Protein backbone atom coordinates (compact mmCIF):
# COMPACT_ATOMS: atom_id res chain seq x y z
CA UNK A 1 0.00 0.00 0.00
CA UNK A 2 1.34 3.43 -0.90
CA UNK A 3 0.28 6.99 -0.36
CA UNK A 4 0.84 10.23 -2.25
CA UNK A 5 -0.40 13.32 -0.52
CA UNK A 6 0.54 16.93 -1.13
CA UNK A 7 -0.59 19.91 -3.20
CA UNK A 8 -0.32 19.60 -6.97
CA UNK A 9 1.91 22.67 -7.10
CA UNK A 10 4.95 23.14 -4.90
CA UNK A 11 6.57 26.50 -4.26
CA UNK A 12 9.62 25.91 -2.10
CA UNK A 13 13.10 27.48 -1.95
CA UNK A 14 14.88 24.26 -2.92
CA UNK A 15 12.81 23.67 -6.05
CA UNK A 16 14.06 24.52 -9.52
CA UNK A 17 10.84 24.44 -11.61
CA UNK A 18 12.74 23.67 -14.82
CA UNK A 19 14.30 20.59 -13.22
CA UNK A 20 10.92 19.35 -11.93
CA UNK A 21 9.36 19.78 -15.36
CA UNK A 22 12.31 18.02 -17.00
CA UNK A 23 11.80 14.83 -14.98
CA UNK A 24 8.00 15.03 -15.05
CA UNK A 25 8.08 14.67 -18.84
CA UNK A 26 9.80 11.28 -18.67
CA UNK A 27 8.32 9.94 -15.41
CA UNK A 28 6.58 6.99 -17.07
CA UNK A 29 9.95 5.60 -18.18
CA UNK A 30 11.50 5.06 -14.74
CA UNK A 31 11.16 1.27 -14.67
CA UNK A 32 12.14 0.61 -18.30
CA UNK A 33 15.84 -0.46 -18.24
CA UNK A 34 16.21 0.58 -21.88
CA UNK A 35 14.68 4.02 -21.41
CA UNK A 36 16.28 7.40 -20.73
CA UNK A 37 16.97 6.07 -17.22
CA UNK A 38 19.17 3.25 -18.54
CA UNK A 39 22.32 4.68 -16.88
CA UNK A 40 20.60 4.64 -13.48
CA UNK A 41 19.58 1.01 -13.96
CA UNK A 42 23.21 0.13 -14.76
CA UNK A 43 24.50 2.20 -11.84
CA UNK A 44 21.93 0.97 -9.31
CA UNK A 45 23.48 -2.42 -8.34
CA UNK A 46 26.84 -0.94 -7.31
CA UNK A 47 25.09 1.92 -5.53
CA UNK A 48 22.73 -0.40 -3.66
CA UNK A 49 25.58 -2.69 -2.61
CA UNK A 50 27.53 0.25 -1.23
CA UNK A 51 24.52 1.53 0.70
CA UNK A 52 23.63 -1.87 2.12
CA UNK A 53 27.19 -2.46 3.32
CA UNK A 54 27.47 1.05 4.76
CA UNK A 55 24.19 0.86 6.66
CA UNK A 56 24.80 -2.66 7.95
CA UNK A 57 28.30 -1.77 9.14
CA UNK A 58 27.14 1.41 10.86
CA UNK A 59 24.22 -0.15 12.72
CA UNK A 60 25.72 -3.63 13.18
CA UNK A 61 23.06 -5.37 11.08
CA UNK A 62 22.96 -8.65 9.14
CA UNK A 63 20.53 -11.21 7.70
CA UNK A 64 18.23 -11.37 4.70
CA UNK A 65 16.17 -8.38 5.89
CA UNK A 66 18.78 -6.45 7.87
CA UNK A 67 16.96 -3.13 7.76
CA UNK A 68 13.98 -4.28 9.86
CA UNK A 69 13.12 -1.45 12.25
CA UNK A 70 15.00 1.25 10.34
CA UNK A 71 13.26 4.33 8.97
CA UNK A 72 14.81 5.40 5.68
CA UNK A 73 14.02 8.59 3.76
CA UNK A 74 14.80 8.84 0.04
CA UNK A 75 14.79 12.51 -0.98
CA UNK A 76 14.12 13.01 -4.69
CA UNK A 77 13.09 9.37 -4.97
CA UNK A 78 12.04 9.54 -8.61
CA UNK A 79 10.24 6.38 -9.68
CA UNK A 80 11.36 4.37 -6.65
CA UNK A 81 14.45 2.58 -7.99
CA UNK A 82 16.06 2.76 -4.54
CA UNK A 83 12.95 2.82 -2.34
CA UNK A 84 11.84 -0.63 -3.45
CA UNK A 85 15.13 -2.45 -2.68
CA UNK A 86 15.29 -0.69 0.70
CA UNK A 87 11.76 -1.87 1.49
CA UNK A 88 12.63 -5.43 0.45
CA UNK A 89 15.52 -5.30 2.92
CA UNK A 90 12.99 -4.63 5.67
CA UNK A 91 13.10 -0.85 6.10
CA UNK A 92 10.12 1.42 6.59
CA UNK A 93 10.70 3.66 3.58
CA UNK A 94 9.46 7.17 2.89
CA UNK A 95 10.08 8.55 -0.58
CA UNK A 96 9.53 12.21 -1.45
CA UNK A 97 9.80 13.91 -4.82
CA UNK A 98 8.93 17.37 -6.11
CA UNK A 99 7.54 15.92 -9.35
CA UNK A 100 4.05 14.54 -8.79
CA UNK A 101 4.33 12.39 -11.93
CA UNK A 102 7.31 10.59 -10.39
CA UNK A 103 5.36 9.84 -7.21
CA UNK A 104 2.43 8.48 -9.21
CA UNK A 105 4.75 6.20 -11.20
CA UNK A 106 6.51 5.02 -8.03
CA UNK A 107 3.25 4.38 -6.19
CA UNK A 108 1.73 2.31 -8.99
CA UNK A 109 4.88 0.21 -9.36
CA UNK A 110 5.17 -0.42 -5.61
CA UNK A 111 1.53 -1.50 -5.46
CA UNK A 112 2.15 -3.93 -8.33
CA UNK A 113 5.08 -5.39 -6.37
CA UNK A 114 3.07 -5.67 -3.15
CA UNK A 115 5.39 -3.27 -1.31
CA UNK A 116 4.36 -0.79 1.37
CA UNK A 117 6.20 2.45 0.75
CA UNK A 118 5.14 5.86 2.03
CA UNK A 119 5.39 7.98 -1.12
CA UNK A 120 4.76 11.71 -0.84
CA UNK A 121 4.68 14.51 -3.38
CA UNK A 122 6.82 17.07 -1.61
CA UNK A 123 10.26 18.25 -0.56
CA UNK A 124 12.53 18.10 2.48
CA UNK A 125 11.41 21.48 3.81
CA UNK A 126 7.85 20.23 4.14
CA UNK A 127 8.90 17.31 6.32
CA UNK A 128 10.70 19.74 8.62
CA UNK A 129 7.67 22.04 8.77
CA UNK A 130 5.47 19.06 9.59
CA UNK A 131 7.78 18.06 12.48
CA UNK A 132 8.46 14.70 10.88
CA UNK A 133 10.41 12.45 13.23
CA UNK A 134 14.07 12.22 12.14
CA UNK A 135 15.12 9.17 10.13
CA UNK A 136 17.81 6.57 10.78
CA UNK A 137 19.06 7.01 7.22
CA UNK A 138 18.53 9.80 4.71
CA UNK A 139 19.38 9.06 1.07
CA UNK A 140 20.34 12.01 -1.08
CA UNK A 141 21.04 10.43 -4.45
CA UNK A 142 21.51 12.28 -7.73
CA UNK A 143 19.26 15.11 -6.59
CA UNK A 144 21.40 17.94 -5.18
CA UNK A 145 22.62 18.86 -8.68
CA UNK A 146 19.01 19.57 -9.62
CA UNK A 147 17.97 21.86 -6.73
CA UNK A 148 18.04 25.66 -6.61
CA UNK A 149 20.47 26.01 -3.68
CA UNK A 150 22.48 22.87 -2.81
CA UNK A 151 23.93 24.35 0.40
CA UNK A 152 20.58 25.25 1.95
CA UNK A 153 19.10 21.99 0.69
CA UNK A 154 21.81 19.89 2.35
CA UNK A 155 21.60 21.78 5.65
CA UNK A 156 17.84 21.13 5.67
CA UNK A 157 18.37 17.45 4.85
CA UNK A 158 20.76 17.12 7.80
CA UNK A 159 17.93 18.14 10.13
CA UNK A 160 16.03 15.04 9.03
CA UNK A 161 18.76 12.65 10.25
CA UNK A 162 18.34 11.39 13.81
CA UNK A 163 21.28 11.43 16.23
CA UNK A 164 23.43 8.41 15.48
CA UNK A 165 22.04 8.23 11.95
CA UNK A 166 23.50 8.45 8.46
CA UNK A 167 23.11 10.43 5.29
CA UNK A 168 24.35 8.88 2.06
CA UNK A 169 24.92 11.25 -0.86
CA UNK A 170 25.60 10.52 -4.52
CA UNK A 171 26.17 13.11 -7.21
CA UNK A 172 28.46 14.28 -10.04
CA UNK A 173 31.59 16.31 -9.40
CA UNK A 174 32.10 19.70 -11.05
CA UNK A 175 35.27 18.92 -12.99
CA UNK A 176 36.41 19.07 -16.61
CA UNK A 177 36.40 15.26 -16.69
CA UNK A 178 32.77 15.18 -15.51
CA UNK A 179 31.85 17.72 -18.18
CA UNK A 180 33.53 15.61 -20.86
CA UNK A 181 32.10 12.24 -19.76
CA UNK A 182 28.83 12.89 -17.90
CA UNK A 183 27.55 15.73 -20.06
CA UNK A 184 29.21 15.73 -23.50
CA UNK A 185 29.74 11.97 -23.62
CA UNK A 186 26.62 10.63 -21.90
CA UNK A 187 24.13 13.22 -23.16
CA UNK A 188 25.43 14.57 -26.47
CA UNK A 189 27.49 11.72 -27.94
CA UNK A 190 26.05 8.47 -26.57
CA UNK A 191 22.54 9.75 -25.94
CA UNK A 192 22.25 7.79 -22.68
CA UNK A 193 20.45 10.72 -21.06
CA UNK A 194 18.34 13.50 -22.57
CA UNK A 195 20.41 16.53 -23.52
CA UNK A 196 20.25 19.09 -20.75
CA UNK A 197 19.75 16.55 -17.95
CA UNK A 198 22.80 18.01 -16.21
CA UNK A 199 24.10 21.57 -16.29
CA UNK A 200 27.77 22.00 -15.51
CA UNK A 201 27.39 25.00 -13.22
CA UNK A 202 24.97 23.02 -11.02
CA UNK A 203 27.27 20.05 -10.44
CA UNK A 204 28.45 19.70 -6.83
CA UNK A 205 31.98 19.33 -5.49
CA UNK A 206 32.72 17.17 -2.41
CA UNK A 207 33.89 20.30 -0.60
CA UNK A 208 30.41 21.82 -0.99
CA UNK A 209 28.79 18.77 0.58
CA UNK A 210 31.35 18.75 3.38
CA UNK A 211 30.80 22.43 4.19
CA UNK A 212 27.00 22.20 4.20
CA UNK A 213 26.71 19.00 6.22
CA UNK A 214 29.26 20.13 8.78
CA UNK A 215 27.08 23.19 9.24
CA UNK A 216 24.24 20.72 9.75
CA UNK A 217 26.16 19.04 12.58
CA UNK A 218 27.41 16.01 10.67
CA UNK A 219 30.86 14.48 10.16
CA UNK A 220 31.92 13.33 6.70
CA UNK A 221 33.82 10.31 5.46
CA UNK A 222 36.09 10.56 2.43
CA UNK A 223 34.25 10.42 -0.91
CA UNK A 224 34.15 7.14 -2.83
CA UNK A 225 34.41 7.27 -6.60
CA UNK A 226 32.14 5.43 -9.02
CA UNK A 227 33.67 4.79 -12.44
CA UNK A 228 32.28 3.37 -15.67
CA UNK A 229 34.27 0.95 -17.82
CA UNK A 230 32.99 1.03 -21.43
CA UNK A 231 34.80 -2.23 -22.26
CA UNK A 232 32.89 -4.23 -19.63
CA UNK A 233 29.82 -1.94 -19.56
CA UNK A 234 30.06 -2.00 -15.76
CA UNK A 235 30.36 0.49 -12.92
CA UNK A 236 32.80 -0.04 -10.05
CA UNK A 237 33.85 1.68 -6.82
CA UNK A 238 37.29 3.24 -6.56
CA UNK A 239 39.35 6.30 -5.69
CA UNK A 240 38.55 8.34 -8.80
CA UNK A 241 35.96 10.93 -7.69
CA UNK A 242 36.31 13.18 -10.73
CA UNK A 243 32.93 12.18 -12.19
CA UNK A 244 30.46 10.18 -10.08
CA UNK A 245 31.04 9.85 -6.36
CA UNK A 246 29.29 9.02 -3.09
CA UNK A 247 29.79 10.42 0.40
CA UNK A 248 28.64 9.21 3.81
CA UNK A 249 27.86 11.60 6.67
CA UNK A 250 27.22 10.66 10.30
CA UNK A 251 25.32 12.60 12.93
CA UNK A 252 26.79 12.21 16.44
CA UNK A 253 24.67 10.07 18.76
CA UNK A 254 25.04 12.41 21.72
UniProtKB/Swiss-Prot annotation:
Residues engaged in binding S-adenosyl-L-methionine: 47, 76, 97, 141
Keyword Methyltransferase: yes
Disulfide bond entries: none
EC annotation from Swiss-Prot or TrEMBL: 2.1.1.222, 2.1.1.64
Pathway stated in the Swiss-Prot or TrEMBL entry: Cofactor biosynthesis; ubiquinone biosynthesis
Catalytic function, reaction form: a 3-demethylubiquinol + S-adenosyl-L-methionine = a ubiquinol + S-adenosyl-L-homocysteine + H(+); a 3-(all-trans-polyprenyl)benzene-1,2-diol + S-adenosyl-L-methionine = a 2-methoxy-6-(all-trans-polyprenyl)phenol + S-adenosyl-L-homocysteine + H(+)
One of the GO BP terms on file: methylation
Entry's Gene Ontology molecular function annotations: 2-polyprenyl-6-hydroxyphenol methylase activity; 3-demethylubiquinol 3-O-methyltransferase activity; polyprenyldihydroxybenzoate methyltransferase activity
Pfam family, one: Methyltransf_23
Keywords of the record: Methyltransferase, S-adenosyl-L-methionine, Transferase, Ubiquinone biosynthesis
SUPFAM superfamilies: S-adenosyl-L-methionine-dependent methyltransferases
Task of the protein: O-methyltransferase that catalyzes the 2 O-methylation steps in the ubiquinone biosynthetic pathway.
Annotated family: Belongs to the methyltransferase superfamily. UbiG/COQ3 family.
Record-given protein name: Ubiquinone biosynthesis O-methyltransferase
Species per Swiss-Prot/TrEMBL record: Maricaulis maris (strain MCS10)
Lineage: Bacteria, Pseudomonadati, Pseudomonadota, Alphaproteobacteria, Maricaulales
